[in-house]
Design a protein with these regions (language model features):
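Extracellular beta-rich repeat passengers
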Residues: 1-204, 208-220, 224-251
Length: 251
């Protein structure tokens, strides 16, 4: 069970009503996830899990790089995730992604009990060298009994129990006094509501000249399918890792 996948060049918009992700993988899957726009997923842009791993169903392996994730997590009824969620022995490399107005940073629940298909992630994973940016909008949905997070920058800097101190140590993380604007060609990070889910096809997530997102460095990532994945006699190759944050560089 499981499968092999190259997930690239897509626009995911408004995934899920009361839960759900843009991309959700489980045990037995080997995937390269790159160059995608993920707008307003209900919970996470990426849920990478090896749930269901067994003697007959192998470990989930994922490379997620150069994706742009916007407004993740705000529409969920209650709080669980809100950006990237890596769990249950998944081996994941998550680098050079651009997170825009998401509710939280990358999470690795149960990280103190790693390498277990019923607990934490594979601790050989690299989840780092990403950029988290925030606008000034306040969410109309706030859970005072949980995090009480109302702004993206609050979520990024919240003391969450699933924030692993070994994750995002080299990432750019917006703060209240330094929100960081990636300078998209046509998307105002201060204007689109955090719970908005209607995707506007005129938006352009290419980066303007001088954007701080144009200079990214990361650990080397070798895509699972850099030499190709054959489907119905046709060979598809995964994109290479690009030296910027997000799905697109300049035009």
């Amino acid at each position: 069970m499981g499968g092999s996948a190259i997930i690239s060049g897509n626009v995911f918009a408004a995934n899920g009503y009361s839960g759900a992700e843009a991309v959700n993988i489980k045990a037995g899957v080997k995937a390269d996830i790159a160059g995608n726009i993920m707008f307003s997923p209900n919970t996470n842009g990426l849920k990478l899990s090896s749930s269901g791993q067994s003697e007959t169903r192998g470990q989930a392996i994922a490379n997620a790089y150069n994706n742009t994730i916007i407004n993740a997590g705000w529409r969920r009824d209650g709080e669980k995730g809100g950006c990237v969620y890596v769990e249950k022995n998944c081996l994941a490399n998550v680098v050079n992604n651009l997170m825009v107005n998401c509710k939280f940073r990358a999470m690795t629940p149960n990280y103190k009990n790693p390498n277990a298909s019923d607990a934490g992630f594979d601790d050989k994973s690299v989840i780092d060298y990403n950029m988290y940016v925030s606008g000034t909008q306040k969410s109309p949905i706030v859970y005072p009994e949980e995090s009480n997070v109302a702004y993206s920058y609050e979520g990024y800097n919240y003391k969450h129990k699933s924030y692993n101190p070994a994750v995002d140590t080299h990432s750019v993380i917006a703060a209240k006094d330094n929100l960081v604007n990636p300078g998209f060609v046509n998307f105002d990070i201060n204007a689109v509501g955090l719970t908005e889910y209607g995707y506007n096809p005129t938006w352009d997530f290419h980066l303007s000249s001088g954007s701080p997102a144009l200079s990214a460095t990361s650990a080397k990532v070798i895509p699972c399918f850099e030499n190709g994945l054959e489907v119905n006699g046709k060979l598809y190759k995964s994109p290479s890792l690009k030296p910027y944050f997000g799905a697109f560089g300049t035009k």
